[in-house]
Amino acid sequence: MKRLVSFGLSVLMAAALAACGSQQSNGSSQGQGAGASQELKLKVSITVSEKDTWGVAVKKWMEDVEQKSNGRIKMKMYANESLSNGNQPKGLEAVQNGSTDISLHSTIIYNVLDPKFAAPSLPWLIPSYEQADKAMNGEAGQKLMELVRSKGIEPLAFGESGYRQITNSKRPILTPEDLNGLKIRTPSMEAMVATYKEFGGDPTVMNFSEVFTSLQQGVIDGQENPLPIILNSKLYEVQKYLTVWNYMYDPIVFGVNKKLYDSLDADTQKLLRETAQEAAKYQIELNRKENEEVLAQLKEKGMEVVELTPEQIKAFQEKVQPVIDKYEGIIGKNLLDAFRK
C-alpha cells in the first residue's frame, strides 16, 4: 500500500512539474492572468499588402516586441485580410471574438460596429494633417478610443491611412456633375455611400480584395483610397484618372482583443502599448513622406492627375452638406466638435 501511495504521489508531482514547465500560450486562446514569463504568439491582421506603410510599420512593431521581450512574445503578420478571406468587417469581428489577436483596421471599417466611427472621416471635416494630429492626439482621439474599447477591442495606438483620393476609368473629375452615373466602389460606411449619392454617383459597397478585378472587368468605374494604397495595389493598371481632393481623413486603429489584453500582466500591456505607439508614429511619418513621392510615381505610371483648388472643392462641400447635417444628429455634435477643434 505504501508503495502505491508513494507511486501515486510521484505521478502527481511529475504532472505538476510538467504543467509548471509549460508556459507557452497562443494569444488566441486568451489564457487568463498571463505572467511575465509566459510566451505569447500573436496573430496580426492588416487589410493591405506588406509593402504598404501599414505592413512596414507592423514589421517594425513585431521586431521591437520580440527584441524587448527577449523573444518571449512573437507576432506574425497576415496581410491582405487573408485571415478573413478578404472580408474586412469579418476581419474586425475576428478581433472582437478573439480568433484574431490584433488588427490594423481603418475607423471606416469600424463603422460596421457603430455609425459614430464615421466621425473623423466625414467629408472635409478634418481639412489638414495639422488638425488631424490635434484631434487624434487630443480629446477627439480619447473619445474614439473609448468607443473602440466599448466594442471589445483595446486600442493601443492610432496610425493613419491618410487622405482618400478618387480614381476612375471614364473621365477627369473636377465638379460634382462629373460623378454623375459613375459606379464608385466604397467600403461599408453608410456616410460614404450617402456622400456619393449626393454627388450623383452610383456607390457600390465591395470588399477591397475584389476591387482590382472588378475595375478590370468593368463591374465598377472607380474607387477611392489613399495614394500609397492606389500605388501598392497597382490600381493605376486599371484606372486612368486620379483626382486629389483630400475629402476624407482615414485613421487606423492598432487594436487588440480586449479579453486577451486584460489577461496580460501590466508589464506586457505596457510593452505592447508603447511599441505600438512607436510603430504608429513611424507609420504616420512614412505615410506622409510617401504621399508626394507616390503622386509623382502615379503620374509616371500614366495616370492623368487633377489636383482640385479650394474653389473647386467648395462646390463638392456645398453638395454634400446634407450628409454632414444628417450625421451630426447620428454621431452627436459633441464628438464632431472635438474633431473640428
What are these regions (language model features)?
Residues 1-4, 8:
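Positively charged n-region of N-terminal signal peptides that target proteins for export
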Residues 9-10, 276:
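Enrichment for repetitive, rod-forming helical segments
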Residues 16-19:
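C-terminal motif of bacterial Sec signal peptides marking the signal peptidase cleavage site
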Residues 21-129, 149-341:
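N-terminal secretory/targeting leader peptides
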Residues 127, 131-145:
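A gly/proline- and charged-residue-enriched helix-loop-helix capping module
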